[in-house]
UniProtKB/Swiss-Prot annotation:
Membrane topology: Peripheral membrane protein
Lineage: superkingdom: Bacteria
GO MF assignments: ATP binding; ATP hydrolysis activity; proton-transporting ATP synthase activity, rotational mechanism
The protein, known as: ATP synthase subunit beta
Subcellular location: Cell membrane
Species name: Mycoplasma capricolum subsp. capricolum (strain California kid / ATCC 27343 / NCTC 10154)
Length: 476
């Protein structure tokens, strides 16, 4: 990580300290008695011609501050001069950041020119209570399983829970694509501790999809020091807050992956010598999560709707990291490996997932009733599966056989072709309106398509699409 040259030039006359100890990403710096930096101040050091930024985490006495490096510390040595910028790390803000890609320090990493724009500190207080507003406006995503079973609200927080390789990132990509095209919305994507290759692919996919000019990307990937991974979510959030507060916009903030934010905090906590808490996590886990999540909210100026991918270690939802995240969310989308193994994508488990706004007063009575009937049908099918496994379908009553057939059709119909997956699947992506989704599931539940085999429901957009495919094959 390298800070911008302007920052260095501007601060040439600032207070200078000396490095007295380097322990991996932890650097201790000694200042004079009257010039000790504040917690979270950014310090700058020249590391063999490269500018390295250190963030003050602790004041350990004797005029010494303990810092975490935002970049590699190879080549640092004792006695080097360190400049105090008298300011926290800052992020660039404004319309100019759209279509650009930055690191944790707000420096461009897309090989395009530097930006001379306003910058804001990444450490800020959450909006005060009087500024908050509670909205219950539904955000249409065009993804059937989400719009029907787990509706989003503008200004809400949504968690995507799932283990490795079940489709969290591609679901986020589809949401960005759909929101940009359907709602003309601005998105900020914070890549926290994920694969660099995925970030590169995402950038080029955004260019191909034509949504890059509505998106700002901020990356602190898994090859970077824990300090960068811990702070990059705050950089992305600061950019989103500016669009909300100063431009009065509804913004989408995507964080992939919020678990890596916790993981980086755990690494930093251990490096700073704090006593670990449950399962080895940092004792400040809830505080760190709260300080991030409380800033993601709706105000009278605009809203930030957040979608956060949550890696679940060993698929254990009781792990402290995902469990702490749960408490802040309005909706939870749980991705299930067993559904993915059936070839059904998005692999959303409609029984484990939930949304606070699936309420008849918000989504309407018909929508609520259909969603509830879908849940009941799938739940009943799950209960019957053990009987089917032992005795077979023939031992079921006629009523139960009908439930099983409809449940399998519902399960298949919850699949959907994604725009961002077109080149992998060969199937064109579809955006399905909420009204079409509700109407289609109503037809299945009412028995209007009991005569159509379940295979026709897989990757069909609406019930009209199912009937069209069935009639076409029947005519052959």
């Amino acid at each position: 990580m390298v800070s911008s040259k302007k920052t260095i030039d501007k601060n040439k006359t600032q207070v200078i300290g000396k490095i007295i100890q380097v322990l991996g990403p932890v650097v201790d710096v000694k200042f004079s008695e009257n010039n000790i930096p504040k917690i979270y101040d950014a310090l700058v050091v020249d590391n063999n011609g490269k500018k390295l930024v250190l963030e003050v985490e602790q004041n350990i006495g004797d005029e010494i501050v303990r810092t975490i490096a935002m970049g590699p510390t190879e080549g640092l040595r004792r006695g080097l001069d360190v400049i105090n910028t008298n300011s926290p790390i800052t992020a660039p803000v404004g319309n100019e950041v759209l279509g650009r890609m930055f690191n944790v320090l707000g420096d461009p990493i897309d090989e395009k020119p530097d930006l001379d724009v306003k910058r804001l500190p990444i450490h800020r207080d959450a909006p005060i209570y009087e500024e908050l507003v509670t909205t219950t406006e539904i955000l249409e995503t065009g993804i059937k399983v989400i719009d029907l079973m787990i509706p989003f609200t503008k200004g809400g927080k949504v968690g995507l829970f799932g283990g490795a390789g079940v489709g969290k990132t591609i679901l986020i990509q589809e949401l960005i694509n759909n929101i940009a095209k359907a709602h003309n919305g601005v998105s900020v994507f914070a890549g926290v501790g994920e694969r660099t290759r995925e970030g590169n692919d995402l950038y080029h996919e955004f260019i191909e999809a034509g949504v890059l000019n509505k998106t700002c990307l901020v990356f602190g990937q898994m090859n970077e020091p824990p300090g960068a991974r811990m702070r990059v979510a705050l950089t992305g959030l600061t950019i989103a807050e500016y669009f909300r507060d100063k431009k009065n916009m509804d913004v989408l903030l995507f964080i992939d992956n919020i678990f890596r934010f916790t993981q980086a905090g755990s690494e930093v906590s251990a490096l700073l010598g704090r006593m670990p808490s449950a399962v080895g996590y940092q004792p400040t886990l809830s505080t760190e999560m709260g300080s991030l999540q409380e800033r993601i909210t709706s105000t009278k100026n605009g809203s930030i709707t957040s979608v956060q991918a949550v890696y679940v270690p060993a698929d254990d939802l009781t792990d402290p990291a995902p469990a702490t995240t749960f408490t802040h969310l309005d909706a939870r989308i749980v991705l299930d490996r067993s559904i993915a193994s059936l070839g059904i994508y998005p692999a959303v488990d409609p029984l484990a997932s939930s949304s606070r706004v699936l309420d008849p007063e918000i989504v309407g009575q018909e929508h609520y009733d259909i969603a509830l009937k879908v849940q009941i049908t799938l739940q009943k099918y799950q209960e019957l599966q053990s009987i089917i496994a032992i005795l077979g379908m023939d031992e079921l009553s006629e009523e139960d056989k009908l439930i099983v057939q409809r449940a399998r059709k519902i399960r298949n119909f919850l699949s959907q072709s994604f725009f961002v997956g077109e080149k992998f699947t060969g199937r064109p992506g579809v955006f399905v309106k909420v009204s079409d989704t509700v109407r289609s599931f109503k037809s299945i539940l009412n028995g209007e398509v009991d005569h159509v085999p379940e295979t026709y429901f897989l990757y069909s957009s609406t019930i009209d699409n199912v009937i069209e495919k069935y009639n076409k094959d029947k005519d052959k």
